[in-house]
Amino acid sequence: MRWGFWFAIATLITICYAAKPLDVKIAATFNAPSFSALIAESLYQEKKEGFIWYLNHLSDLLDAENTTEKELYINVVNSLKREYVLSDEELSSLQFSLGLFSGAPKLQAFSSIVQSRSCDCDTWLQLDEESQVCFSDLPKDSPLFSKLYSKNPLDYEVVKTSATGIPYAVVVTSFERDLIPFHELYYKLALEGKCNYVIRYSPPSSSKLNSKLYVKGFGTHVSLKRTDYLVVDDREFPREKGDNPASFTSSRNKRSNERLFGMTSDSLQTVTPDKIAILDLLATQSIASSTDMLTAFRELTQDFPIYAHYLSIQPDVSNDLIEELNQFQSQYVPEGINTIWLNGLSLDLEETDAFSILSLIKKEKDMFDRFEALGIKSSKVLDIVTNEAFANEDSDFKFVKFHCQDDIEDWKAIHWVNEIESNPKYDNWPKSIQILLKPIYPGQLHMLGKQLHTVIYPIFPSSPSSLPLLSELIQFSRRPSPVQTGMVCAANDDDEFAQTVCKSFFYISKESGTDSALKFLYKCLNSDSSADLYSLLEEHLPLSEHDDDTLANLKKDLSSSFFDHYMSKSNSWVNRLGIDSSASEVIVNGRIISHDENYDRSMYGIFLEDIPEVQIAVAEGKISEDDNLLDFILRDASLTRNPLVYPSAKSSIKSIDIKRVLENVGSLNHEDILLIGSSNAKYSFWLVADFNEKEGLEILSLLADLLSENKDANLMLIQEGKNHVVPPLFAKLLSSPKRSSKHLQEILNSSLDPSSGVVNDMDKALKFLKKSKAVVKELGLTGECKSALLLNGRMICSFSVDSLNTADLKMLMQMEYDNYLSKLSNIAGSSRRLKNSRAISFLSSYLKTLESTPMSTSSPTKEEKLFPRDFIYNKLGVGNATFETDDFSKAYYQFVAVLDPLSKDSQKWSAILEAVSKLNGVGVRIHFNPKQTLSELPLTRFYRYSISAEPEFDALGHLEESYVEFDNLPADTLLTMDIEARDAWTVMQKDVDIDLFNIKLEHTSEAEALDSHTAIYELKNILVQGYSQEEFRKSPPRGMQLKLGNLTNSHVTDTIVLSNLGYFQLKANPGVWTLEPMDGRSSQFYEILSLNKKNSYKDPQVIVDSFEGVTLNPVMRRKPGFESADIMDEDLSSHKFFDKIKKSLSFFNFKRKEASINIFSVASGHLYERFLYIMTKSVIEHTDKKVKFWFIENFLSPSFKSSIPAIAKKYNFEYEYITYNWPHWLRKQEEKQREIWGYKILFLDVLFPLELHKVIYVDADQIVRADLQELMDMDLHGAPYGYTPMCDSREEMEGFRFWKKGYWKKFLRGLKYHISALYVVDLDRFRKMGAGDLLRRQYQLLSADPNSLSNLDQDLPNHLQHLIPIYSLPQDWLWCETWCSDESLKTAKTIDLCQNPLTKEKKLDRARRQVSEWTSYDNEIASVLQTASSQSDKEFEEKDNNSSPDEL
């Protein structure tokens, strides 16, 4: 985007007074909790001991009824310091949490489980669902306990005993003084073991504490607006009656007298082009020379537009700085690139916010605590997790090469589909391997006419997971590619159907070619097993073989030894490589990887990993032109694979922190457990099995033999939980003082029948069984994984002596040594503790759990884990262009940022880094990385971010309302404002006194009072989001419906699962929710197997208890009989499918008559809202049918939402607001207008309830002159939507018709280019064909180029006409003066006020001149609004007059 207009504005405005400040707030839908409760919650999250300390000291901390929040805060902080309850780092984390009000959602969530108050106190004992008892009503002689208790994840478990049958005391409180006697009573009883003591929160009854909660953790920006077309309303809009946000005045609402460069005016002044080029360098130099670099950084970047001129007249950049930057940018990070690490973890600059930083700090603190428990000092922790030995590889998991060629199977297993060296379409590709030495663009593959990159797809006809593999193989085969693809068709010996399919595939391939064979196989996999296989077979054979005799002989031939031989070779290949028919695995250059959401990245990563190895060999002459390149890659590959040892996906590996398990069961020193071998061993095996059974003893025998050969290994025996009989093995081991591997072998070689082992000490034996049960519970061994083998924390489930042998166990030990033990021994150096073998085994175990712990759960496409970490940040030097806090190297939490100071990332992160730098234990280092040459102004917006390192209070000691303030905005300049909030927030305008889309602030002088304009937004929802997939197919359950319910209503809201990543979003708010398949086809087809891919779906509860929202990863299992069915595959012409669904939708649980005409539209800014009123009037004017309007709520102003009811009532139409949060995985649009265009086209499948079959989009600035029922009834001839083609009858505009020349002319190839101002959508057809998914995929691809999709909402559907057909509406459905002749206006059914690039006429002027009825409509609407406003004034005055003094 070019900002030449900015210079024009700056030239005109040479003297400009200061503008009134603009304050921005976001209000939650729920009230603020009591501050005492917020402290309690934050302490509970920080450290449970701190929470209990707070309860014990409430009487001292709340020393008076009127203790202010500030006094309470100071008392708590000082007491925590004085009594060393929290470390300095924990105390800062607590203060940060309080400053963000991060505990408020958790406290609000209690409202979903706490019964309504029925007593006259703020703290009570909950006896049962209805009965509540105040302390004064408790009997003095014997305490009461709760009669019913249902455990809830929200509960504060103050004291929980392990004994059974102990009653519960459930105390509900606001954490004020009346909790004190309850706590003193029940805490004492709980410590005596007489009860379990649980606390729940309920807000206080005192109205003074029920204040509105204004949240933090969001950004907002005010941008200079493009003025190519003026879109400002020329009327003053009416304000709502009630509180006037313009009256908001703050103690902070004072202009600072100390500004950068000594600036005194908020004016935009010119910057010459030669100075623009070096602005980034000048900014770096100015910040570096400041005495307070962090503050200067934030002020300069956030208010850059007013500082640009002053920056440009600073002294020239020093040569020393340029030289330093040249060295940094050439060695480490290219110029202008932004990146931030926290202790080596790479942060997502866009997604990371204040709340996620708080969460990360807590995770880091937990990590430091665990390392400390392992005997490692905090100063050494970062040396381990960022050590280069770990950082360069995926420690416990790397793709091992296996011999995937089928020479061992006599070349009869693999069927090559895309055989590069023999396929004629590759004849023109270079055959010389020297081509590999030529440079190509990063990420590309050389177009070599030889087999190098190879992908082999195992296809099992009876497995649903094979269908997406086969689909991908077919797609690969349709286009030339440097990747050779093949497949192996395999089937179990007892699977007659699959065997016949594979044999038929071999036959068709031989007789009719690969294409026919693939089509046959696809149809077989895409139909159910009852399909007529031989009819499909006949369909794909040459016509000459369609006679009855040939087909009869064919059935016999398929049973012959010839095809049996091929089948056996295929199955032999699959078994040798350990391919599981249900695992959806693919072989890439010998590596066996999972076909999951990371498949593409893994595949290309393998290709790019192999290329350098081959290139070096070619350059050194180690490979000749005649050598097979794949053989070279596989020269050291293993012949066989055990998938238990080498799984195809890291996500399949489960890791356990074995030290934590031992701590939790009270056996850190091996109390009451059976340990074979030395307790001080590097290799710690745990075996969970039923030692009363032969299979458990057989695997134990293998391990005993292994231990006898390796003195550095020990073995812990754990009896499987289901059998409570003392195994004879245990009896013999318990009766002997020996616990060696030799003694174990002797026992195993002796008789182990039940009578052979006499238990001398039954109590001891029962303790062993009890301890085993506790360990099994800690390990989470349920369902399919009841037995397990662990080695230093890595867990293998579901094994036997047939699936795991001695060689496999030795390989596990070798992998453990290579990937962990050897590296940890080297890192340990002089650490005495790490020289202890047991400590190293514990540490290895813990590192594995870090490897499987995601840094964030918000995205399935980002696999960043807590370990290993990037070590490069340790190598970045410190120079003149670097800021660093004191004692950075000693900090627990080291933030290292590489930032271009004049970038949008810096506007946000300058505030965040400044705030976190105030926390104890936090170190901040910033390497400024400017672009050395700029061609345009880098920033054209003002920015603020709401964050504070601790709570802030006003002069009276009350918590100050959270807001951000723009106090440097230029007056009389057209601006536009927007909010940057995390993707889990649904934020809407609530109370605003200006047009935020077209801001023009009035100027004031310094002497004038500076009461602020205030924009109040509302946090309407916190989302539950997810990325779902089917259990075996690993593909999204597209079209599945999910419902979200609560404890009182099982169906509150619902949604559809998208094909894009299996994504879904559901609008929620803090509370306890349930997630289930929608009643109907979804519940018939699917059950939810798990909510997070690993844990079983025992409880459908979803807890929304933080501002971060909830991100799930559900796995769906198809129910029997629906394995191959398509949930969307039903006759949609009669709407049967959607008629079934709509009956269960939450939106339509009541009967209502559906409107005949459904119209949706979007508007932003008061002018377009004015147009929108008039559009609705024009629609109603030309129809007698029932009309309903659907308005996209995201962009509407509060004034519109307060006025539209009067319009709807006057003209008798219905309306409803719709919205959908832009998913964070879908590339966002930074300009608001382009975001609006995105909403017009990208979410049509999820914006509307499923009951809606058809909808018409009408631009807000359009005038309708026809009955839109005609458009609703129009046959779209199978297309999902209909658009009007662009007019070409106005000849003088021919030069502007871009679709008739260049790219579009070539692309369209005779197809029409359509305008998006009006279109009709068949929503049923749209959803059925997955049009929304296709549009979003193509958008994601094209939007990567910022110069594409100039008219997003219009270009995208036109670009996809070959996949999503457009029905061309008759030309008279849309007339636009810019493109259409004056003569055609006579028959126009709608008139669009589209822009004219020649005249750039204002919208209002054009409307009044061009549309004869527009002014009368406008006046009539104005009259309706005036009447409604007068009525509102009257009602407000009556209410005001009737109010009591207290209410006022």
Swiss-Prot record:
Entries under InterPro entries matching the protein: Glyco_transf_24, Nucleotide-diphossugar_trans, UDP-g_GGtrans, UGGT_TRXL_1, UGGT_TRXL_2, UGGT_TRXL_3, UGGT_TRXL_4
Subcellular location field: Endoplasmic reticulum lumen
A GO molecular-function descriptor: UDP-glucose:glycoprotein glucosyltransferase activity
Keyword Membrane assigned: no
Post-translational modification: Glycosylated.
Positions of region (Disordered): 1428-1448
Origin superkingdom: Eukaryota
Essential cofactor(s): Ca(2+); Mn(2+)
Signal sequence, renumbered to the chain: 1-18
Region annotation Glucosyltransferase: where it falls in the sequence: 1149-1448
GO cellular component: endoplasmic reticulum; endoplasmic reticulum lumen
EC number(s) reported in the record: 2.4.1.-
Glycosylation sites: N66, N749, N880, N1046, N1441
Transmembrane stretches, start-end: none
Sorted UniProt keywords: Endoplasmic reticulum, Glycoprotein, Glycosyltransferase, Signal, Transferase
Family label: Belongs to the glycosyltransferase 8 family.
Subunit annotation: Monomer.
Protein role: Selectively reglucosylates unfolded glycoproteins, thus providing quality control for protein transport out of the ER. Unfolded, denatured glycoproteins are substantially better substrates for glucosylation by this enzyme than are the corresponding native proteins. This protein and transient glucosylation may be involved in monitoring and/or assisting the folding and assembly of newly made glycoproteins, in order to identify glycoproteins that need assistance in folding from chaperones.
Protein name, per record: UDP-glucose:glycoprotein glucosyltransferase
Organism of origin: Schizosaccharomyces pombe (strain 972 / ATCC 24843) (Fission yeast)
